[in-house]
């Protein structure tokens, strides 16, 4: 009889929450690397709340945008805090999502195909949102970043120029561009929220992967209380780091050029995106051809989709494949070095290093399955 059951098991809405956060059967051996999903949810909520307060004072107009952000920081109660939390919150969002994806590659969680595909879509949406958010303060780097990145579409044969003008809403970046970027920057986080729910829905169809990469149905425990407390440790650490950065060095990850109002007549010496796009920007710059660069840029993220198709191993997870582990960490270092190269000027040693690193980055996805097949032959034959 339902009368004796707790409300979380009988109420139509609470039942869904209960199945996702309280009574969810969870592998008992998942490590701290499995915390990052919930940390990403926390980051998203922080971004939506701080963004909502910022949008109350922000003005999407090229004459007023820069000064409205200035006004928020100087005159609004705790406006400086809300703005820097929002800007640095985005950085933490990307740190968490990159670790989350890295964990997915390391333990080969991409075999949960639907979850993985939705995750890649979320990554694209997040990148689009962050890019458009960077344009909103309408500083020098906002303006020129928007100019450079939207101009990449002109590399598309035949349709390119028309497409760029369509996105700009005119023949140059103007008020129409800022207004539409603001519109999409506002709506996309809610689409990300919806996609996150779909991501979770697919995950809960199959259950989580675990550090051993084997079926854990024999040894599952309820999510609450053990993993709720374990997640809370992650929340506290990330919240502390975010608040520490925001209160000690809030503009550390920003660009000094963005303290100057946008001026179409003066080009900054070195145009670069925020740090979390630098690896992709370095890949873009490594290809001498414009269209080739754009394709490489998109493929640097889209290549994640092919991972489930390159799985030919007998055991899941590279924790049992020493050579693949070395290869994985080389790839991680490659991405860090690409991030460094993206922030360097387009000069001789940097260009060549960027090209070498780009080849190394893409070759990981080719060499990794080959090495694992070779290792399987060594072990099983």
Curated annotation (Swiss-Prot):
Keywords: Electron transport, Heme, Iron, Membrane, Metal-binding, Mitochondrion, Mitochondrion inner membrane, Respiratory chain, Transmembrane, Transmembrane helix, Transport, Ubiquinone. PROSITE patterns: CYTB_CTER, CYTB_NTER. The keyword Cell inner membrane does not apply. It holds the Pfam family Cytochrom_B_C. Heme b b566 binds at residues 100, 199. Its main location: mitochondrion. The chain crosses the membrane at residues 36-56, 80-101, 116-136, 181-201, 229-249, 291-311, 323-343, 350-370. It comes from the Eukaryota. InterPro entries: Cyt_b/b6_C, Cyt_b/b6_C_sf, Cyt_b/b6_N, Cytb/b6-like_sf, Cytochrome_b, Cytochrome_b_C_euk/bac, Cytochrome_b_N_euk/bac, Di-haem_cyt_TM. GO terms for biological process: mitochondrial electron transport, ubiquinol to cytochrome c. Heme 1 (or BL or b562) is low-potential and absorbs at about 562 nm, and heme 2 (or BH or b566) is high-potential and absorbs at about 566 nm. Component of the ubiquinol-cytochrome c reductase complex (complex III or cytochrome b-c1 complex) that is part of the mitochondrial respiratory chain. The b-c1 complex mediates electron transfer from ubiquinol to cytochrome c. Contributes to the generation of a proton gradient across the mitochondrial membrane that is then used for ATP synthesis. This is Cytochrome b.
